[in-house]
Amino acid sequence: MKYTDTAPKLFMNTGTKFPRRIIWSMGVLKKSCAKVNADLGLLDKKIADSIIKASDDLIDGKLDDKIVLDVFQTGSGTGLNMNVNEVIAEVASSYSNLKVHPNDHVNFGQSSNDTVPTAIRIAAVAEVTNRLLPALQQIISSLNKKAEEYKDVIKAGRTHLRDALPVTLGQELSAYADAFQHEHEQVMNILEYVKELPIGGTATGTGLNSHPEFQERVINEINRITGLGFKPANRFRAMRLLTDLLLLSGALRNIAVDLYRLGQDIRLMFSGPLTGLNEIDLPTQEEIAGSSIMPGKTNPVTVEATLLISAQVVGLDHANQFASMLGEFELSMGIPLVGYNIVTQVNFISEALEKMSRLVIDGMVANVEKMKRYAESSPSLITIVSPVIGYDKATEIGKKLNKGMSIREALRELGYSDNEINKILDLSKLVKPGFTAK
């Protein structure tokens, strides 16, 4: 394998290999191209059949150890394409007892400039469809179930990390369920853009040295194999610009940001048990020791691992922004890096969503009495009488509350009866619109 053997001297050798999904997508693409070229009478059927058989080996993961070239290579991804071409040619030759050539046969009617941009989009769509979308549905379902379970559990609201008006735990969880639902819809919409494939563009998008029907036929064959509904792209756009993948990266970043926020809220509610909030318990987090020196300590380890994942996904999105700007005229120069990053982002965020759902949210237990006690002792409750006595007087009462006077005592000084005060301090009325003091 002349190219593959020589390239490591010139490329980077960081040990960063292409993920399984991209190797799989290259196998799907090479298989599809071989079949179409044979059907068009442009490739000997026996050679095509041997390429298809070798491509199946690549699809099934049997040749992964032979895809050795680093992600940090030529910006077109020629290293990946030629590595795959040479591996398939070698295996196909052994199957057919014919001399299968990596360029003349495996790469017939193709260029690295259209194959790798096509393959990374196939990989992205497949990974999102098979992993991310189910993981999003899982966390949406988990959050909605917990929101319903705790819809009447009142807790202190907090803004700026200071006491604020009460909310319910269900309301807080519903916010994240709604956010992830919107992000699920956003990803679905973006995916339609990513499904546009530039195969058939060959070197510069014109399609020179490929059959006029090649693009459409190859995409039909890819759809037959994957069932993912790909369609032809404007080849000139999809070979020079990676904007569709950048949109997907941005959607993954948004999921990571909201997942980070959810994780931070859970960590704070789990803080304690004696000197923190201690508003929730997370039984699964007690399965391993939280400290190597403090016996009995438990930490929100799954949540913290999720925060690290979120940080990495956001960082990879920033790298994608920069890599998407690389290139001039007919071709992007960030193709292998963006492809690698996107699949990595999808894998990382899907893993985090799945484990947050199963190990954290599903098992979350509210400390109901602790939450109620915090809610009833919050100085922000003065807000409920503000519409009646005015903002200035309410502020004065707030100062008294901060000095230790209870809100009941303050309201009595204003002439409210105990019966009226009980009605005012019915916290269930404070978590929905209305003027409870009137």
Curated annotation (Swiss-Prot):
Note: There are 2 substrate-binding sites: the catalytic A site, and the non-catalytic B site that may play a role in the transfer of substrate or product between the active site and the solvent. Alternatively, the B site may bind allosteric effectors.
InterPro entries: Fum_hydII (IPR005677), Fumarase/histidase_N (IPR024083), Fumarase_C_C (IPR018951), Fumarate_lyase_CS (IPR020557), Fumarate_lyase_fam (IPR000362), Fumarate_lyase_N (IPR022761), L-Aspartase-like (IPR008948), Leu-rich_rpt (IPR001611)
Known role: Involved in the TCA cycle. Catalyzes the stereospecific interconversion of fumarate to L-malate.
Pathway assigned to this chain's UniProt record: Carbohydrate metabolism; tricarboxylic acid cycle; (S)-malate from fumarate: step 1/1
Residues annotated as signal peptide: none
UniProt entry keywords in alphabetical sequence: Cytoplasm, Lyase, Tricarboxylic acid cycle
Complexes and interactors: Homotetramer.
Sections of the chain in a coiled coil: none
Name of the protein: Fumarate hydratase class II
Catalytic residues identified in the record: 160, 291
Keyword Lyase applies: yes
E.C. no: 4.2.1.2
PANTHER family assigned: ASPARTATEAMMONIA/ARGININOSUCCINATE/ADENYLOSUCCINATE LYASE, FUMARATE HYDRATASE CLASS II
One Gene Ontology MF term: fumarate hydratase activity
